[in-house]
Amino acid sequence: MSGYSGTPLPKKLGVKEGARVAWLNAPDHFDALLGELPPGVAVSRRLGTGLDVLVQFATSRAELRRRLPKLRDAIFPDGAAWVSWPKRASGVPTDITEDTIREDALPLGLVDVKVAAVDETWSGLKLVVRKELRG
């Protein structure tokens, strides 16, 4: 299934053939939203290391703030950590916004490079390690 743009969600998220990915705290319907993944993609539901792409779903800023350093450590230097939060219009209680994610991510050396709709409920902000901090 594709999002509003018609682009398949795996492509929006940057999931490529052979990628190591993790979906953290994903809603039950996330697999259906993703549809078919590229060949050889290894999916985990737990935080590991050496990930190409991870998607962390969150509704609490305090919890996300605690998780962000672990998310940064989990991705390859050129990988991406997506943070997905409920859209204001979704009616899902949250204290997270695009701005609060930036406020908490920037001091950790994470910068945002893209925003995308995941579905009617969730937005996503793509975070990457600042270029000068990549080893």
Model-derived features: where do they sit?
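Mid-chain, well-packed structural core segment of small domains
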Residues: L64-I96
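Short, intrinsically disordered, mixed-charge
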Residues: P39, P69-P77, E103-P107
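N-terminal, charge-rich interaction modules
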Residues: M1-A32
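Short, glycine-rich nucleotide/cofactor-binding loops
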Residues: L54-L64
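Conserved Class I S-adenosyl-L-methionine
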Residues: D95-A116
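Short acidic low-complexity segments
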Residues: G40-L51
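Class I S-adenosyl-L-methionine
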Residues: G109-G135
